[in-house]
Amino acid sequence: MAAQGEPQVQFKLVLVGDGGTGKTTFVKRHLTGEFEKKYVATLGVEVHPLVFHTNRGPIKFNVWDTAGQEKFGGLRDGYYIQAQCAIIMFDVTSRVTYKNVPNWHRDLVRVCENIPIVLCGNKVDIKDRKVKAKSIVFHRKKNLQYYDISAKSNYNFEKPFLWLARKLIGDPNLEFVAMPALAPPEVVMDPALAAQYEQDLQNAQATALPDEDDDL
């Protein structure tokens, strides 16, 4: 039974991607989740309970963060088991982190076959972007959702969670009625740059996919 006032609707969300892509920074932005996180020693994981208030009541994502184990190779199956959704993160200033996305995706779907997955390109606040919108095609091949994000500026923080919530609840009209308390931005996302990136993504979306897999 959920405790009094606890959201009845809860989902296990696994957060994966190369070390240094900003996964922990991202999940720590949600202040109550950071305050109430629990450490699971057997798996070496921190679980952050992130609550979002929607027009259909509160939803909790129990976000599993690896605490850096991915630097030592793959993650154990216990991390993925019973995950109901996932975020795969890479760093837009580091091409190798995007090149490794297919490996993370493969590990994930081997254990969790048909779960909704969002791909996030983090650090878009940094001017020296290496992985441009037109080269981000993996999500289109695998039917994932994609968002540019900037954890340190809170840019698009809620987008992956809203998309996952709509998929998991089965309601495309689900909305967040209030934003969670987020840590104050450490950097400011340039609105002109954000607008440019949104346009680039729209243009890329309208372009035919390349046949070869050289871009992965």
Curated annotation (Swiss-Prot):
Knockout mutant characteristics: Morpholino knockdown results in defects in eye development and reduction of cell density at the neurula stage. Co-knockdown of nemp1a/b and ran elicits reduction of cell density and eye defects more significantly than the individual knockdown of either one.
Binding site for GTP: 18-25, 36-42, 68, 122-125, 150-152
Co-factor: note: Mg(2+) interacts primarily with the phosphate groups of the bound guanine nucleotide.
Cofactor(s) demanded: Mg(2+)
Record keywords: Cytoplasm, Developmental protein, GTP-binding, Hydrolase, Magnesium, Metal-binding, Nucleotide-binding, Nucleus, Protein transport, Transport
GO biological process assignments: eye development; GTP metabolic process; mitotic sister chromatid segregation; protein import into nucleus; ribosomal large subunit export from nucleus; ribosomal small subunit export from nucleus; ribosomal subunit export from nucleus; snRNA import into nucleus
Transmembrane segments: none
GO cellular component terms given for this protein: cytoplasm; cytosol; nuclear envelope; nucleus
UniProt catalytic activity: GTP + H2O = GDP + phosphate + H(+)
Lineage: Eukaryota, Metazoa, Chordata, Craniata, Vertebrata
Family label: Belongs to the small GTPase superfamily. Ran family.
Switch-II, as annotated region: 68-84
Record's subunit section: Monomer. Interacts with rangap1, which promotes ran-mediated GTP hydrolysis. Interacts with kpnb1. Interaction with kpnb1 inhibits rangap1-mediated stimulation of GTPase activity. Interacts with rcc1 which promotes the exchange of ran-bound GDP by GTP. Interaction with kpnb1 inhibits rcc1-mediated exchange of ran-bound GDP by GTP. Interacts (GTP-bound form) with tnpo1; the interaction is direct. Interacts (GTP-bound form) with tnpo3; the interaction is direct. Interacts with kpnb1 and with tnpo1; both inhibit ran GTPase activity.
Limits of the Small GTPase Ran-type domain: 7-171
Protein name: GTP-binding nuclear protein Ran
Natural source organism: Xenopus laevis
Gene3D superfamilies given in the database record: P-loop containing nucleotide triphosphate hydrolases
Coiled-coil segments on the chain, per record: none
Region annotation Interaction with RANBP1: where it falls in the sequence: 211-216
Cellular localisation: Nucleus; Nucleus envelope; Cytoplasm, Cytosol; Cytoplasm
GO molecular function terms listed in the Swiss-Prot or TrEMBL record: GTP binding; GTPase activity; magnesium ion binding
Cited function: GTPase involved in nucleocytoplasmic transport, participating both to the import and the export from the nucleus of proteins and RNAs. Switches between a cytoplasmic GDP- and a nuclear GTP-bound state by nucleotide exchange and GTP hydrolysis. Nuclear import receptors such as importin beta bind their substrates only in the absence of GTP-bound RAN and release them upon direct interaction with GTP-bound RAN, while export receptors behave in the opposite way.
